C-alpha cells in the first residue's frame, strides 16, 4: 500500500457520507494493523473525525440522510481516505426503498416523537409571555392534556410561521436551525399521518362489524316475526279445533241423553237436545225435526268410531271425526237453540248420602271429584258419561274443602280430622273403560303429602304455584311450601276475633245448618296468588296479607256477619257472607263497586267475567249478570224439587251444583 500524506495547505470543508464513522472505526481497528495508514495519517485527525461522527449533535450520525461538513482535513486527504474504503461499502442505499420496507415505526421511535411534541408544546405554553405566578398553573394544566391536544397545539405553532419572515432572515445559523426543526417536525407529522391512517382502518373495520351485526340482528328480527305469525296461527287453529272437539262432545252428550231415560226423576227426555237436533236445526213451528236429520242407528254407528283425544291436558274418551256440526255456533248457543241459560244437562242422583260439602271438576266433560257430609271418601265421576269411576278414603271424618290442580295432577283436601292431604290423581285422569280395581288402587300410601300441624278442623284451603294456605278452626292460617314440605309461617287471627259475636243458626229458612261444624267457620275462605293472600273470617272482615312480610296490608269492611266465600281475579274481589249480601270490590282502588242482597245467607259463590253464581239455600243457584247488572232465572221448573243448592262450582260456562240431599247437577250457563 502506498503511503498517504497530508496536504499542508488550508483546510477546506469535505463532504463525507453517512457510513464514514463505521469505516473509520474499521480503519483504526483492522486496516491500520495491516497497512501503514496510521503512519501516514496523524492519529489525532482520525480520532477527531470518529468523535465528530459519534457526536449526538451530528444529524448524519443519527439519521444518515444528511452530509456533515468537518474542518479536519483537506479534500485530498479525504479523497485518499475514501479511496481506501471497499467499493461495496460505498454504496448508499435508496432511502425511499428503505422506508418502503420499514413503514411501521417502532414503539421507541413513536415515544421519541410524542416526547418531542409534548416538550415543544409544553415549552410554548409555559414561556409564552406568562408571569411567574402563572407558570405553575400552566404546567399543571398541561399534564392533563391528551395527545390530540398536543397535536392541535403543535400544528397551531407552525401555522403561525410566515414564509415572508423566512425570506427576510440572513443568518445561516438561524436558517439551519429552522430547517432542522422543520425536518424533525416533518417526521413527527409523518408519524401522526401513519397513526391516523391506522385509526381510520380500525374505524372502517368496526363499521364493517357494526354493519354485519346490524344485518344479523335484522335477520333475527325477521325470523322472530315469521315465527310469531306461525305461533299465532297455531294458537288460532288450536282454539278452533278445541271448540270443534267441545261441540262434538256436546253432541255426543245430548245423543246419550236422548237414547236413555231421564237422568233425573220427574223430568222428560224432551228437555235434552239430541245430536241430530243440534246438527240440522229444530223447527219451532211444528216441533218436529227436519227430514234429513240423522237417525238413531246412524248415530250409533258413528259413535263407535270415536277415539281418545286430549283436551287442554285433560283426557276424554270421545273425539269427533265424522260428526256433522254447526261450526260457527258455540256450545252456549247450541244449548240456546231449545233451552235458556240454566239448562240441566245431567244429574248424579244420590251421589252422596248427605248434603254435598265440596266438589271440584276438570272442565269441560272431564272428571268430577265430590265429598259429602259424614262421608270420609272422595268420589270420582266421569262428566262425559255421568258414570261413577271410583272413590278413595281421604280422611277420617267429613271433608270440608278441596281443590283440584290438573297441571300437577293432584287434589288437595281438608277435613274435620284437622288434616290436609295431597293425592295423586293421575290414575283417575288416565282411566280406561274398564273400571275394575280402580277403587282398590287408592290406599293410604297414595297420599303424597300430609299437613298435620293444625289442632282443629280445616275450614278452607288455597293452592297456587307450590304454595299452600290452610285455614282452621284453631284460628290460624298456615303457609306451606310443598317443595320442601314444611310450614314456612303461621298467621294467628285469634286476636282479631275476640270481640266477635257467637254464631246463631237463624239464617236458613228450613232451620238447617249447612256447615259441617256446629258454628260458622272462623276462617271461611282463602285465596292466594303468588305473594298475595285474601282471607275472610267470621267477624265479617276481609284481610289482605303480604306473604313475604306476613302482615296485613289492607282490611275491607262492609259485611256484618261471617264471610263464607270469596274469590278474586286481576280486577275484582267478590265476597259472600251470612249477612245475605254479595259485595264486589275494585282491587285497583279498593272501593265497593256493587252490592246486592238475597233472602238467605250466601253459602258458596263462584264467578267469571260474565256471571256471578251463588248458592243461597234455594232450589236454584242465583245467577247475576255482571254486564247487564241483573239477575237471571233458570228456565227449568224446580217447583217439585225439595232439595236446596248448598255448593256451586263454575268454570268455562259450566256450572255444577251440590245439593242438600246429596245430588249433583251439571248445568250450562
Curated annotation (Swiss-Prot):
GO terms for cellular component: mitochondrial outer membrane. Keywords: Coiled coil, Membrane, Mitochondrion, Mitochondrion outer membrane, Repeat, WD repeat. It is found in: Mitochondrion outer membrane. It holds the Pfam family WD40. Its main location: mitochondrion. Residues 189-222 form a coiled coil. It is a peripheral membrane protein. It comes from the Eukaryota. SUPFAM superfamilies: WD40 repeat-like (SSF50978). GO terms for biological process: mitochondrial fission; peroxisome fission. WD repeats lie at residues 351-391, 394-433, 453-492, 516-557, 558-595, 597-634, 640-669. Belongs to the WD repeat MDV1/CAF4 family. Involved in mitochondrial fission. Has a partially redundant function to MDV1 in acting as an adapter protein required to form mitochondrial fission complexes. Formation of these complexes is required to promote constriction and fission of the mitochondrial compartment at a late step in mitochondrial division. This is CCR4-associated factor 4 homolog. The lineage of its organism: Eukaryota, Fungi, Dikarya, Ascomycota, Saccharomycotina. The gene is CAF4.
